[in-house]
Amino acid sequence: MLEAAKNVFQSKGMDGARMQEIADKAGINKAMLHYYYRNKQLLFEAVFNNAFSLLAPQLNTILNDDSSIEKKIRNFTSNYISFMDKHPYLPAFVIQELNRNPEFILKMKNNLGFPNIEKFKIQVNQEVKDGILKPISAEQLFMNVMALNVFPFVAKPLLMAFTNKGDEDYNKLIEKRKTEVADFIINSIKNF
């Protein structure tokens, strides 16, 4: 059911999705779908929570381990891009829901396992103080890392058109970003 719902929500969005279409795609009747998920919003939240629960633990592990900021950036970039290769619908899905319902993320934020950047912020501040990193706000650095990793997935059709790449060539380009993005960010913040 969740896989069918994910596919319909991904292609039609929350507002365009219909419970009957989801039931048909899942090979069940609509009454059964309503038995498990009383309404479309509850089903959507289950799909979103399921998808987010796959990514959040990875982010938390990277953000809260004891490695250097450079290593965190490399691990985050590589893991995020590998994860998105397996779940390419997720970034657009999240952005779409945040635009449709900004309060939804506040509910998510209260869930156990929501990524916490406090240790990352402390580490950035310490590495700046130790002269390892150029002066930079930890929040700005985190936003830069997120933006450079998320945007190529959210804007895939646009970027494919700009770069004149088909799916296979675009996927190769994305694979190279595992090192390109990390190198770009690290070279911009590291004191050499």
Where are these regions (language model features)?
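Amphipathic alpha-helical linker/stalk segments
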Residues: V47-N75, I117-V128
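Helix-turn-helix
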Residues: V8-L42, A46-V47
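Hydrophobic alpha-helical connector segments
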Residues: N60-A92, D130, A138-F142, E175-K178
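Residues in soluble alpha-helical coiled-coils and helical-bundle/repeat scaffolds
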Residues: G27, R38-L42, A46, N64-S68, ...
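Short hydrophobic clusters on alpha-helical segments that form packing/core surfaces
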Residues: M1-F9, Y80, I185
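Amphipathic, non-transmembrane alpha-helical scaffold segments
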Residues: L2, F44, F48, F52, ...
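Amphipathic alpha-helical segments used for helix-helix packing
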Residues: D85-L106, K156-N164
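C-terminal peripheral helix-coil segments that are non-catalytic and often amphipathic
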Residues: N79-S82, K86, F114, E118-K134, ...
